[in-house]
Design a protein with these regions (language model features):
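Ligand/cofactor pocket segment of small-molecule handling proteins
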Residues: 1-2
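Short, glycine- and small/hydrophobic-rich beta-strand elements in well-ordered beta-sheets
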Residues: 35-56, 60-64
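An amphipathic, aromatic/His-enriched active-site/gating alpha helix that lines ligand/cofactor pockets
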Residues: 41, 62-102
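Short amphipathic alpha-helical segments
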Residues: 19-43
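Beta-strand elements of well-folded, non-transmembrane domains
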Residues: 13-15, 63
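Active-site-flanking beta-strand signature of metal-NTP-handling nucleotidyl enzymes
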Residues: 6-12
Length: 113
């Protein structure tokens, strides 16, 4: 079995109850092409959690997962570009995000061993 690792990323939503409800509605029916692209990239599991307007995404990836390769593949897929454009109206990068970065990688500060 391929070794995996967990990554956590954060993002804010526009602080508007109607937009947040619409964002959640879209995520109850993520397009099959989007799910397929996620899996092709080496992401085995993904969860998105929300409190207020803050999102945390937890992903389980293969050890050789390459975020840059995923971004390149996503940019070449018209359906994923369409999904990302749709989601962009809801999302706000964190102040700590690098220029052009949407989901900001989080640093693990504790692990119960």
């Amino acid at each position: 079995m391929t070794a995996t690792r967990r990554l956590c990323l954060a993002l804010d939503l526009t602080d508007d109850a109607d937009l947040i409800a619409d964002y959640e509605r879209h995520h109850r029916a993520v397009w099959p092409e989007v799910k397929a692209g996620i899996r092709r990239a080496g992401i085995h599991d993904m969860e998105i959690w929300r409190v207020g307007d803050r999102l945390v995404m937890i992903i389980e990836v293969t050890d050789d997962f390459d975020p840059a390769a995923k971004a390149e593949a996503d940019a070449a897929d018209p359906r994923i570009r369409q999904w990302e454009a749709l989601m962009a109206r809801f999302q706000r990068p964190l102040p700590q995000a690098r220029p052009g970065e949407k989901w900001a990688a989080m640093t693990r500060i504790f692990k119960l061993d």
